[in-house]
């Protein structure tokens, strides 16, 4: 299996999804399960400029990229772009600028914020020349839960909560 990594802007990903060049629902994928709150946290991360995990796609024989890992993230991005979900400006840690965007949909954002969202880059890893068992094994490895210990959870917080 070959893995090629590239950075794609959200506007390119949205265009490819809408054109059918990226398939969010290949046969092996589960349905969309993220809550609105989880989708809003992802959008918040993007608006803050924080990096999110890469998207993994399988390039199939029909020249379509089937999403192996990242379906929920891409669906959340699409839903925000399509004005289905809005920004939650109360997500912690507080950000005085993002809090002013509370309740806004993509269409309500200033041109500058829309541009920042559209031009945010996400790493996309395209898998080619896969043996039949390889994508499923990679998916399993990428999605193995690794629970944090109580100490690790405490250390992840800053400020009063951590003391």
What residue ranges belong to the model's regions?
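Basic- and aromatic-enriched surface patches that contact anionic nucleotides/nucleic acids
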Residues: 1-12, 26-36, 40-163
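A short, surface-exposed helix-loop junction/capping segment
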Residues: 19-26
């Amino acid at each position: 299996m070959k893995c090629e990594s590239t950075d794609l802007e959200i506007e390119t990903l949205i265009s490819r999804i809408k054109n059918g060049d990226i398939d969010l629902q290949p046969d092996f994928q589960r349905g969309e399960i993220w809550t609105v709150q989880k989708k809003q946290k992802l959008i918040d991360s993007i608006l803050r400029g924080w990096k999110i995990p890469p998207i993994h796609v399988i390039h199939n024989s029909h020249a379509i990229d089937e999403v192996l890992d990242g379906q929920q993230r891409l669906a959340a991005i699409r839903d925000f772009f399509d004005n289905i979900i809005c920004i939650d400006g109360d997500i912690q840690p507080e950000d005085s600028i993002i809090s002013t965007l509370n309740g806004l949909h993509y269409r309500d954002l200033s041109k500058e914020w829309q541009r920042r969202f559209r031009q945010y880059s996400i790493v996309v890893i395209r898998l080619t020349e896969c043996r039949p068992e390889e994508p499923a094994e990679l998916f399993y490895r990428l999605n193995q839960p690794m629970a944090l210990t109580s100490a690790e959870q405490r250390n992840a917080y800053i400020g009063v909560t951590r003391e």
